[in-house]
Amino acid sequence: MRTIVLGAGIAGTLTAYHLLREGHEVTVVDRQPGAGMETSFANGGFMASSQAEPWAAPGVPLKILKWLGREDAPLLLRPSAVPQMWRWGLRFLANCTEARALASGERSLKLAHYSIAVLKQVREDTQIAYDEVIKGCIRVYGSAEAIDAAGRFYAKLAPLGLNYRVLDAAGCVAIEPALGPSAAKFAGGLFFPDEESGDCHKFTQAIASVCQQGGAALRYGTNVMALEASGGVITGVVTDKGRLSADRYVLALGSYSPLLVRPLGIRLPIVPVKGYSITVPAALWPGALTVPIADDERKFGLSRFGDRVRASGSAEIAGYDTTPNEARANGILKNATDLFPGFANCLDPATNRVWCGLRPMTPDDPPILGSSSYRNLFLNTGHGHMGWTFGCGAGKAVAALVAGKTPDIELTGYALDRFARHRQPQSD
């Protein structure tokens, strides 16, 4: 069976990896010069099932309104993006209820748990290294009220296997001593001992090398222009370097997925949400953190990758623009140095690497996985802010579906048809 995977990020590369193990002849196509060069390149690095708390939740619409006009707001909506996303926005608002938020959180948690288990197996099978840190994750909060609110949500997910402990500030410092200098600035946090972190880019590139050694054709530097279809099936891929064809196709182009399939009558409710990261050398910060830390109220995180430290966060809805905004990058740095004064020692414009990537967000948070209205086109997209967490599991599950097998995880809750309104294949 010949399969073309469109996209060489974490989702596409892991799909290719598992397809090879199913015996497929695999071609991966990506416009970048290598694997993991877009959203997978410099994300926060959290492999965190605790991120299953959806963005679409009660209280979020009011927060967005309060943040309007603030360049340093945790979530910034550019007016120029509104005309292109109003349908998505209405769906997002419809999901901002307690019941729907919990349902979305449960689906995300199930996929996260499955995916982390798959990651561990892949790591054992390949023996690759990617600056992984297997020490859990702490989410800190500024007040007892905020801790209680977070705890109430996570308590509802505990029956599904979410393991966490509530800590005061001293308890957080005991796990991550780098929090010591700012212990008076936060009330405490939640510790998730089963979580990990690591360099998604390194991991994706290493898996791509494994795929190449296993016989996959990696067509980097190749722009996908269009999909050709006839009789309810995809017949080929038009690229700037010629036409490609296969028996089956997997769409894993992240935020760009809707643009490719819209001419075919498929409507993917995905909008790009720009995120930021600033990566700095750790050498100038004696006692730099090793446990990944997320500040849930200020919406940023700090993680360690070997000799590097990365601050990440922010959500900016501004279309497909990936240009860094200095005010937003500085806002992340300000928050990071407030929580970790030692982080300030690392800041130097000559060595700081500011990066922006586009999170492919669905209006209810879980990704879109599974079949499409074209018999041989499969979807692995819309992973939002959890692409690194979801990538391994989503790749294995979709690969099983492509191979005609039943995935280990039930994909009904991640299917495109949960949004009900997407068109059928166009007639010839």
Please annotate each region the language model reported.
Residues 43-46, 51, 55-95, 180, ...:
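Active-site substrate-recognition segment that forms the wall
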Residues 44-170:
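Dinucleotide-binding Rossmann-like beta1-alpha1 core, especially the glycine-rich loop
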Residues 148-160, 180-248:
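Helical element adjacent to the flavin cofactor pocket in flavoenzyme catalytic cores
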Residues 21-41:
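Glycine-rich FAD pyrophosphate-binding loop
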Residues 2-28:
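N-terminal Rossmann-like FAD-binding beta1-loop-alpha1 element of flavoenzymes
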Residues 7-9, 31, 36, 383:
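Glycine-rich Rossmann-fold phosphate-binding loop(s) that bind the pyrophosphate
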Residues 140-145, 170-175, 272-273, 281-284, ...:
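Flavin (FAD/FMN) cofactor-binding core of flavoprotein oxidoreductases
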Residues 103-116, 139-149, 190-209, 323-330, ...:
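Short beta-strand to alpha-helix junction loop
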